[in-house]
Amino acid sequence: MREWCMLRESRTNTPRRAAERGKRPGGSSVRGGERRIVTALCYDLVGSTDLMHVMDIEDYQELMSAFQLASKQAIASHSGVMQHEAGDGGVALFPIELEAKDAASLAIRAGLGIVEACKRVGREAGQDDLQVRVGIATSVALVLEGSREGWTREPVTGAALAMAARLQAITAPNSVLVSEETRHLAGRSYAFVFQGSKELKGFAAPEKVWRALGHKVGVDRFYAFGRMGGPLINRENELNTIGQLWDGVLAGQGSVVLIQGDAGIGKSRLLREIRRRTRAKRSKLLFFQCLPGGFRSTLHPLLNNLPEAVSGSAGQMGPTAAAVAALFERNGIRDPAVVDVFSYLLGAQGSRLQSNEDPKAIREKAHRALLRALEAVCRRGPAVVAVEDVHWIDPTSRDLLGEAARIIAKFPVLLVTTSRPSYASEWLDAANPTRLALRPLDSDETRLAIKAKWPEHRLALLPDLFDATERISGGVPLFIEEICQWVSQNVEPDTMRLSESANPSHVSAFESILESRLQQLGTAREVARAAAVAGTQVTLPLLRALLPDFGKSALANAADTLCETGFLTRIRVPGRTAYGFRHTLIQETIYNAVLRKQRQVLHRRLFTAVNQNRGMAAWIDTGALAEHAERAGLVEEAVPLFIAAGKESSSRSAMIEARQFLEHALDLCGQMSESDTAEALKLLALTALGPILIGTVGLSSEPARRLYEDAVEIARRRPMSEQSQWFPIYWGWWLTGQDFRVMHDRALEVRSMLSKANEPEIQLQVNHCIWAIDFNLGRHRETQDAIKAGLALYDEKRAKESRTEFGGHDAKVCGLGQLALSLWLTGRTKASDAALSRMIAFTDRIAHAHSKAHSLDTEAVSAFYRDDFERLTEVSARMADFAKRHKMQSLSGQSLLFSGWAEAHRTGLASGHARFQNGLSLLRELGAVADLPIYLCMHATLLGLAGKIEPAIEVVNEAIGRGEETGHAYWLAELHRCRAILRARAGERKDAVAADLRCAVEIAESQGATALTRRARHSMRELGIVIGR
């Protein structure tokens, strides 16, 4: 039995707070400040200003002095230190030398003492209504090394001071309000009343706040969990549920399970038990691990099952198609079509699919490949597919996982996924997954878990261990494992004290435990930090680049020590040994504890080394390397890499990831100072993002139009020698013009600007935009001239790239189609037929999806012109089939519209008109109504045939107005002819009918549209209208 075992690996990590600790720039040994827990107290008299107005000034001053003296005594008697004193209030801090629990407890006692002191001072002064408000908060603060003795006299960097002031402001008179962190630390010693979650000015998230009522004797609360390798505790209900689902799988009914829980709660442990219990009857286990930072890395759970992709063996950057085929074959998947699709999506070298294929077609192929892969996997019997930590999944993997979940019921497969509870998993809802939410253990289960882990010769320490576990772990199993291990190894029976810097929040508590353990490991502590910056995978050569002052043997010994102590694990990859963190949470926590400037130094070293030699860490792809550059502060180096990563994703039809990379590149450009370099980088990002935005948001969308307008504004500032480089920007600016007149003016401007450019492709695309606009403006001679000039420059090899850069379709397909339509309108029917045949044959040969859609649209319009309803029915059917296969909504709308038009004329007016209206509604909803005047003309005609003359005239009036407003002129003659016929049927005056027919003739003749002139004159004869030439 083979498993797809995911090598744990992270591209980069999310940086947080901290500051540099370094002996010298670039030095590998870093020292300086550290993060400590600080509790702050803020107090303020209620209504002191009003008192000043009603009391004698001397009496008021004596009252304030007595109050401040009593308040300071209450603070000092509980180890607090005044930070700031105002006339009627002040701020105090409680020393970092105290354990965090004690500092919080003493601060609350001081606060309650201030309330009592205020009451006493008021009574003695005859002011019984004297009242005070007290706020207390706890947070992490940065304490610089060397200033620890006088830390309270230095500015304190932390949230506690600001939060305490905010809490004081909302506290009821003569009350003490404390933050969630403070209550968490001191909760065993005081009674608290929950006051709800409050919005505090300057803080993004609501804060849970509590009112302190007074001291009370200790309240025991125990939290615990089972160790990964120990007995499984408190999971029997979940296992029974999964057992029932597995029985269904054995009977042929697939199921989806989503296990949710906080980091470290035991999701992986439960999954391990599932693997153990299904081992006897399953034929295969496929295991995938999603990783931090993997959201932008296409199919990264699959990619990291490939040794080449992880190790960069043989100098490869990423996998080869042969490696993908070998991996699939080892797991029983031998279908070449399946291997080809996944090789393409992975960006494997030697992939046989073309990068310019339509993204929707690729997605459809991927779904079919997934279906075949599942069939192959189940060929020998039931299987288990496990995907861990889907909260880090990339969009492409999520799409495929969602599709797998949707169809899994057809196969004997148990699909198990795990995620954190905050992750939005509605994309799995269609599969109706069984959701299992893991909770912490209760007190009895805690005792069982700790006894299973605890050495028998130290059982006497268990009561104290329970107390420490309650304060530190918060019921998270992995935290308890680390706490137990550290306490059992380092805590003496007569002290039973943990780190003084134990933090109130669960994650920071774990950070304190890990930091305490790392301090015992000497230089291995620096190696662990460097490895955390690199990600959850690192090699000795990479560590050498990150820590240049360490020798090879020192690094190897440190890595071995970290493996022996449970921080790292060895990962065997071809040609070398790599190291990965035993759990992603360990890597994340160590990374977050590294001060920001130290992280920046390490990221910079990593970027420099890997950028010079990508083979050193081939698992770090372009996007990940860009993130290292960004976190190193090398924004100018990061932006081109993010752009390159976006292009790589786009070439694999991973449009969501591509858009994310490119939009982030633009954000970084905005952070750069105004410079020539920043402008050029921004244009490069916009050039790549524009076509993606058009494809994902829409051609007529405001975001696409605004992007190109902003880009052109920048491009115009660039030197004339660069203008041809930014031609795709100008082309997109033309394409997203709000109407045809604007588009025509822009096309002429671009042609004038780039008239001296010698590149044939630029000149072709200039003509491409001109013939498209001139056609719609009814300028047929100019249209045909532009097509002739443009197609003379067509290069089929270059066109493979241009199809994605310019409009998403092939210029030759567009040119031949536009020529066919223009020739018919100008009365050259045979030449039109020939051009149409050439277009269809060429489109079928190049097999480009969007170009085929363009061709089908042209075929349908051509049949519409000719009133060839039978031909239009056949073309519409092909349009519908193609739209369904490639998920093209606008083409689906056009198929409904044209098939409805044909049906209304051939078989059923009512049913055909209804189908037509469905198509028109869909196109309007999508914003894909560039030919709206024509569609409205068709709509008005069908209304007229149904005898609904007045509504028909209203529709054609709208169409004429839209055509005149937008410059959409080539069908204006037909619109006037249509209105003349409707007016005649409505019995309107003959001069109104004649006026419309006169306009139709004049417009058609001015455009050289012979076919439309003939129609207008034929209608004159039918209606008995005589108009001189």
UniProtKB/Swiss-Prot annotation:
Keyword field: ATP-binding, Nucleotide-binding
Residues in domain Guanylate cyclase? 39-168
Q: Name one GO biological process term.
A: intracellular signal transduction
Locate the compositionally biased regions of type Basic and acidic residues. Answer: 1-23
GO terms under cellular component? cytoplasm
Q: Where does ATP bind?
A: 261-268
Segment Disordered: which positions? Answer: 1-31
Under InterPro entries, the record lists: A/G_cyclase, AAA_16, Nucleotide_cyclase, P-loop_NTPase
Query: What SUPFAM superfamilies does the annotation carry?
Result: Nucleotide cyclase (SSF55073), P-loop containing nucleoside triphosphate hydrolases (SSF52540)
Q: Which Gene3D superfamilies does the record match to this protein?
A: Nucleotide cyclase
What molecular functions are annotated in GO for this chain? adenylate cyclase activity; ATP binding
Instruction: Kindly provide the name given to this protein in its UniProt entry.
Output: Uncharacterized protein R02095
Q: What species was this sequence derived from?
A: Rhizobium meliloti (strain 1021)
